[in-house]
C-alpha cells in the first residue's frame, strides 16, 4: 500500500483578498459590473494604459544590438539604482553629494520592503535583533504586516493614523504613539498617497512627526509607491522623504515603479538607503548583497532599463512627467465628479474627504454591510474596508456608482 502524499496535511490557505475580488469580478456576467478593487491605473474606457514613453523606450531597447541577456549584478543595474535614488532624494540632495546613499534593485516595492526588513532583522539595533518593535499605520497596506513578520520580526504594532469620525488623519494619536514607542523602534511610513486611506500629513504635520521621531531615535522606513502619481508633482510627492534626509535621519525608502511607469508585471523596485557616512553605505550594501543572493540572486533587466533610460534622458524624462500627470489628473477629476454627484443626491454624511484625499485610493467610509450590498446587489466590487480605486471610475459608470453608493448608505446602516 502506497503511503499518503507528503503534502496530505497541507492546509488550504485563504486567498489574497484583493486578487479574490478581481477573480469574482471577472466571473460576474452582469453587464453593470464595476471593479473598484483593482490596484492599477485604468483609462476612461476601463483599460490598462501603456505609457507612450514606455512604448518608445521599449522599441529603442529592442533595437539596441549592444544589449544582451547576461546576468545583472546582484545589487542590480547601476544606472537604474542611481536614477531611482536620485528621483526619491532630489538632484540637490546633500546625502547624494556626500556619497552616503546606496540603492538595491528589487522585485517591485514588495521586494524592496522585504530586503530592507531582512537586513533590519539581522543588523539593526544589535545583531539579529528581531525583538525590535515595528510599527505600521492603522490601517495600512496588508502586505506590510506580512513582510515584516516573514522577515522574523516578533513585535508588529499599529500606530494610530485614521480618524473614523472625522474621516481624516489622527495626528494627535499618531504623535502620541510615536512618543510612547520604545526608542529605536522602526516606523513604516507612507511617503505619499497613503494606502488605503489616501490621507497624507501636510508638510507642517510631517515636521511634527519628524521632530518626535528624531528625539525618540525612531527609524523611518518609507514606502514610496506613488511618487508623481499622487499629485502629478514629483517633488511634492517626495517632500516627506527629502525633509527627513535634510533633518539628518538615516533611513530606508522602498520605491516602486509599478504605478508611475505602469510597469506592473515587470516588478521594478529599488531600496534607497541613506546613512550618516559613506563607509556605512559600503558595509550595508555588502550585507544586502548577501541577502539578495539567497532571495532572487540577480534582478531582471527589462523594467530597470526602461526606467533608467527614461530618467537619464531629459527629453524622455519630460515626456514621462507628462504621462504621469495625465494619470494623476484623471484620478483628481474622478474624485471631484464622485463627490459632486453624492452631494447632488444629498447622500447622508459628508463627502469632502473624497477630494481631500490623494492618490489612487479613497477610503469612502462605507461599512462592511454597505460594501456587501454594493457587491451583491449592484455588482460594484470593492474591499470590505470601503477602499475604492478611483481609476475604476469612468465618465460612463460614475452616475451608476454614485447612485448605488447613495442607495447603500440610505438603505443599510
UniProtKB/Swiss-Prot annotation:
**Sorted UniProt keywords:** Amino-acid biosynthesis, Aminotransferase, Cytoplasm, Pyridoxal phosphate, Transferase
| Requisite cofactors | pyridoxal 5'-phosphate
Report the sequence similarity comment from the record: Belongs to the class-I pyridoxal-phosphate-dependent aminotransferase family.
Q: Which GO terms describe its cellular component?
A: cytosol
Tell me, how does this one assemble? Homodimer.
| One Pfam family it belongs to | Aminotran_1_2
Main localization category: cytoplasm
| BP GO annotations | 2-oxoglutarate metabolic process; aspartate biosynthetic process; aspartate catabolic process; aspartate metabolic process; cellular response to insulin stimulus; fatty acid homeostasis; gluconeogenesis; glutamate catabolic process to aspartate
Residues involved in L-aspartate binding: 39, 141, 195, 387
Instruction: Report the superkingdom from the record.
Output: Eukaryota
Q: Which residues carry this modification: N6-(pyridoxal phosphate)lysine?
A: 259
PANTHER family under this entry?
A: ASPARTATE AMINOTRANSFERASE (PTHR11879), ASPARTATE AMINOTRANSFERASE, CYTOPLASMIC (PTHR11879:SF3)
Q: Catalyzes what?
A: L-aspartate + 2-oxoglutarate = oxaloacetate + L-glutamate; L-cysteine + 2-oxoglutarate = 2-oxo-3-sulfanylpropanoate + L-glutamate; (2S)-2-aminobutanoate + 2-oxoglutarate = 2-oxobutanoate + L-glutamate; 3-sulfino-L-alanine + 2-oxoglutarate = 3-sulfinopyruvate + L-glutamate
Q: Which organism is it from?
A: Sus scrofa (Pig)
InterPro entries from the entry?
Aminotransferase_I/II_large, Asp_trans, NHTrfase_class1_PyrdxlP-BS, PyrdxlP-dep_Trfase, PyrdxlP-dep_Trfase_major, PyrdxlP-dep_Trfase_small
Localisation per UniProt entry: Cytoplasm
Fill in the misc note.
In eukaryotes there are cytoplasmic, mitochondrial and chloroplastic isozymes.
Q: What is its EC number?
A: 2.6.1.1, 2.6.1.3
State if Cytoplasm is listed as a keyword.
yes
Q: What is the annotated role of this protein in its UniProt record? A: Biosynthesis of L-glutamate from L-aspartate or L-cysteine. Important regulator of levels of glutamate, the major excitatory neurotransmitter of the vertebrate central nervous system. Acts as a scavenger of glutamate in brain neuroprotection. The aspartate aminotransferase activity is involved in hepatic glucose synthesis during development and in adipocyte glyceroneogenesis. Using L-cysteine as substrate, regulates levels of mercaptopyruvate, an important source of hydrogen sulfide. Mercaptopyruvate is converted into H(2)S via the action of 3-mercaptopyruvate sulfurtransferase (3MST).
Q: What class of enzyme is it?
A: transferase
What Gene Ontology molecular-function terms does this entry list?
L-aspartate:2-oxoglutarate aminotransferase activity; L-cysteine transaminase activity; phosphatidylserine decarboxylase activity; pyridoxal phosphate binding
Asked whether the keyword Transferase is assigned, the reply is yes
What is the name listed in the Swiss-Prot or TrEMBL entry for this protein? Aspartate aminotransferase, cytoplasmic
Amino acid at each position: 500500500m502506497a503511503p499518503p502524499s507528503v503534502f496530505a496535511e497541507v492546509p488550504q490557505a485563504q486567498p489574497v483578498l484583493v486578487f479574490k475580488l478581481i477573480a469574482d469580478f471577472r466571473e460576474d456576467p452582469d453587464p453593470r459590473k464595476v471593479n473598484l478593487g483593482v490596484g492599477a491605473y485604468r483609462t476612461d474606457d476601463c483599460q490598462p494604459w501603456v505609457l507612450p514613453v514606455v512604448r518608445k523606450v521599449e522599441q529603442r531597447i529592442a533595437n539596441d544590438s549592444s544589449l544582451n541577456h547576461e546576468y545583472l549584478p546582484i545589487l542590480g543595474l547601476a544606472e537604474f539604482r542611481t536614477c531611482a535614488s536620485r528621483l526619491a532624494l532630489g538632484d540637490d540632495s546633500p546625502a547624494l553629494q556626500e556619497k552616503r546613499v546606496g540603492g538595491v534593485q528589487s522585485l517591485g516595492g514588495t521586494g524592496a520592503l522585504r530586503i530592507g526588513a531582512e537586513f533590519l532583522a539581522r543588523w539593526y539595533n544589535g545583531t539579529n535583533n528581531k525583538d525590535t518593535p515595528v510599527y505600521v499605520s492603522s490601517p495600512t497596506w496588508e502586505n506590510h504586516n506580512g513582510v515584516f513578520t516573514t522577515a522574523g520580526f516578533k513585535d508588529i504594532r499599529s500606530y494610530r493614523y485614521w480618524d473614523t469620525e472625522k474621516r481624516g488623519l489622527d495626528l494627535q494619536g499618531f504623535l502620541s504613539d510615536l512618543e510612547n514607542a520604545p526608542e529605536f523602534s522602526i516606523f513604516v511610513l507612507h511617503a505619499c498617497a497613503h494606502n488605503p486611506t489616501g490621507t497624507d500629513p501636510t508638510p507642517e504635520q510631517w515636521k511634527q512627526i519628524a521632530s518626535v521621531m528624531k528625539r525618540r531615535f525612531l527609524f523611518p522606513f518609507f514606502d514610496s509607491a506613488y511618487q508623481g502619481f499622487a499629485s502629478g508633482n514629483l517633488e511634492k510627492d517626495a517632500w516627506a522623504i527629502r525633509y527627513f534626509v535634510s533633518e539628518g535621519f538615516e533611513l530606508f525608502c522602498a520605491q516602486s515603479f509599478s504605478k508611475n511607469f505602469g510597469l506592473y508585471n515587470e516588478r521594478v523596485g529599488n531600496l534607497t538607503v541613506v546613512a550618516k557616512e559613506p563607509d556605512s553605505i559600503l558595509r550595508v550594501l555588502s550585507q544586502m548583497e548577501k541577502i539578495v543572493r539567497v532571495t532572487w540572486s540577480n534582478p531582471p533587466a527589462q523594467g530597470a532599463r526602461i526606467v533608467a533610460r527614461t530618467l537619464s534622458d531629459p527629453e524622455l524624462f519630460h515626456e514621462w512627467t507628462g504621462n504621469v500627470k495625465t494619470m494623476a489628473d484623471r484620478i483628481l477629476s474622478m474624485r471631484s465628479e464622485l463627490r459632486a454627484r453624492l452631494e447632488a443626491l444629498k447622500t447622508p454624511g459628508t463627502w469632502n474627504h473624497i477630494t481631500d484625499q490623494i492618490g489612487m485610493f479613497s477610503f469612502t467610509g462605507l461599512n462592511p454591510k454597505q460594501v456587501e450590498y454594493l457587491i451583491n446587489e449592484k455588482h460594484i466590487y470593492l474591499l470590505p474596508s470601503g477602499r475604492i480605486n478611483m481609476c475604476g471610475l469612468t465618465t460612463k459608470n460614475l452616475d451608476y456608482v454614485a447612485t448605488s453608493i447613495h442607495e447603500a448608505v440610505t438603505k443599510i446602516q
